[in-house]
From Swiss-Prot:
Pfam families: PPV_E1_C (PF00519), PPV_E1_DBD (PF20450), PPV_E1_N (PF00524). It catalyses: Couples ATP hydrolysis with the unwinding of duplex DNA by translocating in the 3'-5' direction; ATP + H2O = ADP + phosphate + H(+). Phosphorylated. Sumoylated. This is Replication protein E1.
Length: 631
């Protein structure tokens, strides 16, 4: 049977304690005595601890601990962020004490720049403005702070300028150590040089990229030199140079030396650095070595003015490039270029090739004012071409004006003394040639006598035919023609400007060509010669030497040449010693002695020259003379 609703059944079942809890003995409006109140309070105190609230207290304590931990972590993160910003933009206070905090690595900066991803264009604006503001404030206060990490927006100039403050509170050895640790030592040295001497090092020198290029004049800057060694340098270096200009300044790095030096001979940068390092005990990283700008008036004026001050030590005579640009008399000597002087120089020195003229005449700029004006001109190529053409014209006219005797005298005057005629005679005898008969024919050969104008050297290979003929052609400054060019109309053109010609190694086809087209040429009679880009010219063929392995006298098909040639057999192998050198020396010195020895036998004395007691030919002069008389 179901239980009835309500609580009428008091004390029944398990609900009795609810009844006790719910019974209200007092009603609204009843008077409560003080005794009951105290009893009630005592009753309430008896109920303390009836309910377990420890779980609620533990949960609240855990929540408060987590909030405190989060607050501590946020505070620490904010502190670190603020500290990083201060180090980034304001610098570290350690910079005022030590400079070790300011080591700006260029490689690190480059990596930062390379890895920096560009944003929309406004991401780095705050950083740049903050950096500029900090720098302005720093410079405005007249004090720079070192240390701290450098941002990627710092330029190379700012880093160099900040590095210069390393001088404050540091000893010279520490300065040198910091210098060697720098990422760009050369830039740091150049900045220090400008700070001390007031002029950039690059304005005084011209750059040589190669360390092996030689030069006489050099500018050397040495940093961190000991004072005793700096004074000793002035004495030790005198034995190696003709001139030096030394300036010594003292700074926190030690002694800094600026030296302009002219060595007795040309030296390269490697040699100079090695020599100076051994004297002043300074590594190559602490040196700047370059040649000076010898054509700069500003550089010449700088050394000229500093030479008059008391900070410079001078030894030797001042270089001409300084005198020329600073002294009045040298300035007056500057002149305009004259082609005639250049042609006269080329003629006197037998320089007829255009490349040789340009190269050797440019080297005279230090001693010749006309050569200096030539280098300053913008028409050097035209001047070189015109000079070569005129020099060749003069040489050709001089050669054609001389006879054989005068020409031999002329070429002998250009050969050194000390030769011996015996090796030539011994070589002819070694080949079985009768020397007396050879001289008789050689006399007619040099005169260009008809039917005696061609000398043929015949023999097997390696008998010295070409060596003998080439040495004679070289002494005579003759011309060589080659049958390989026979298909050209101009292959005989070299004979037009020669006193002696040569055709080396004539083959059977060459002899057929000579027999068909060149009979008059071998006779020594006048022939018509075709020249390239020029009109035909009529000349008398000079004496010709032909070397061959074929004896033309044994060939019946060449019978018309037999009376026009003289064959000299060379049948024995050319002698060579154990060192590979020829036993018989055939050179210009020996040929000169040979002609001087056989001068009378070759009948080179002419009656028309007896009245001339001086040179066979007057001295050529193409430079206009100057009248020194005053009217």
């Amino acid at each position: 049977m179901a239980s009835p609703e309500g609580t009428d059944d008091e004390g029944g079942g398990c609900t009795g304690w609810f009844h006790v809890e719910a019974v209200v003995k007092k009603r609204t409006g009843d008077i409560i005595s003080e005794d009951e109140t105290e009893e009630d309070e005592g009753t309430a105190s008896d109920l303390d601890g009836f309910l377990d609230n420890s779980n609620v207290i533990t949960t609240q304590a855990d929540r408060e601990t987590a909030q405190q931990l989060l607050h501590a972590q946020n505070t620490y993160a904010d502190t670190q962020t603020l500290h990083n910003l201060k180090r980034k933009y304001l610098g570290s206070p350690l910079g005022d004490i030590s400079n070790q905090q300011f080591v700006c690595r260029e490689g690190v900066k480059r990596r930062i720049i390379d890895t920096d991803v560009a944003d929309s264009g406004y991401g780095n604006t705050l950083e740049v403005e903050a950096t500029q503001q900090v720098q302005d404030n720093t410079y405005g206060s007249g004090k720079q702070q070192d240390g701290g990490s450098q941002t990627s927006v710092c330029s190379r100039e700012n880093s160099i300028e900040a590095d210069s403050d390393m001088d404050i509170g540091a000893t010279p050895p520490q300065q040198i150590q910091e210098l060697l640790k720098s990422s760009n030592v050369q830039a740091k040295l150049c900045y220090k040089f400008k700070e001390l001497f007031g002029i950039p090092f690059s304005e005084l020198v011209r750059t040589f990229k190669s360390d092996s290029t030689c030069c006489h004049d050099w500018i050397c800057a040495m940093f961190g030199v000991n004072e005793t060694l700096a004074e000793a340098l002035k004495t030790i270096i005198k034995s190696q140079c003709m001139y030096y200009h030394i300036q010594c300044l003292t700074c926190t790095w030690g002694v800094v030396i600026l030296m302009l030096i002219r060595y007795t001979c040309g030296k390269n940068r490697k040699t100079i650095i090695k020599s100076l390092s051994s004297i002043v005990n300074v590594p190559s990283e602490q040196m700047l070595v370059q040649p000076p700008k010898i054509r700069s008036p500003a550089v010449a004026l700088y050394f000229y003015k500093t030479a008059m001050s008391n900070i410079s030590d001078i030894y030797g005579e001042t270089p001409e490039w300084i005198q020329r640009q600073t002294q009045i008399q040298h300035s007056f000597q500057d002149c305009q270029f004259e082609l005639s002087k250049m042609v006269q120089w080329a003629f006197d020195n037998d320089v007829t090739d255009d490349s040789d003229i340009a190269f050797y005449y440019a080297q005279l700029a230090d001693v010749d004012s006309n050569a200096q004006a030539f280098l300053k001109s913008n028409m050097q190529a035209k001047y070189v071409k015109d000079c070569g053409i005129m020099c060749r014209h003069y040489k050709r006219a001089q050669q054609q004006q001389m006879n054989m005797k005068q020409w031999i005298t002329h070429i002998c005057s250009k050969v050194d003394e000390g030769g011996d005629w015996r090796p030539i005679v011994q070589f002819l005898r070694y080949q079985g040639v009768d020397f007396i008969s050879f001289l008789s024919y050689f006399k007619l050969f040099l005169r260009g006598t008809p039917k005696h104008n061609c000398l043929v050297l015949y023999g097997p290979p390696n008998t010295g035919k070409s060596c003998f003929a080439m040495s004679l052609i070289q002494f005579f400054q003759g011309s060589v023609i080659s049958y390989v060019n026979s298909h050209s109309h101009f292959w005989l053109q070299p004979l037009d400007n020669a006193k002696l010609g040569m055709l080396d190694d004539a083959t059977d086809a060459c002899w057929r060509y000579i027999d068909e087209y060149m009979r008059n040429l071998l006779d020594g009679n006048p022939v018509s010669l075709d020249r390239k880009h020029k009109q035909l010219v009529q000349i008398k063929c000079p004496p010709v030497i032909i070397t061959t392995n074929i004896n033309p006298l044994h060939d019946a098909k060449l019978q018309y040449l037999h009376s026009r040639i003289h064959v000299v057999p060379f049948l024995n192998p050319f002698p060579i010693d154990t060192n590979g050198n020829p036993v018989y020396q055939l050179n210009n010195v020996n040929w000169k002695c040979f002609f001087e020895r056989t001068w009378s036998r070759l009948d080179l004395n002419n009656d028309e020259d007896k009245e001339n007691h001086g040179d066979s030919m007057p001295t050529f002069r193409c430079v206009p003379g100057e009248n020194s008389r005053l009217f």
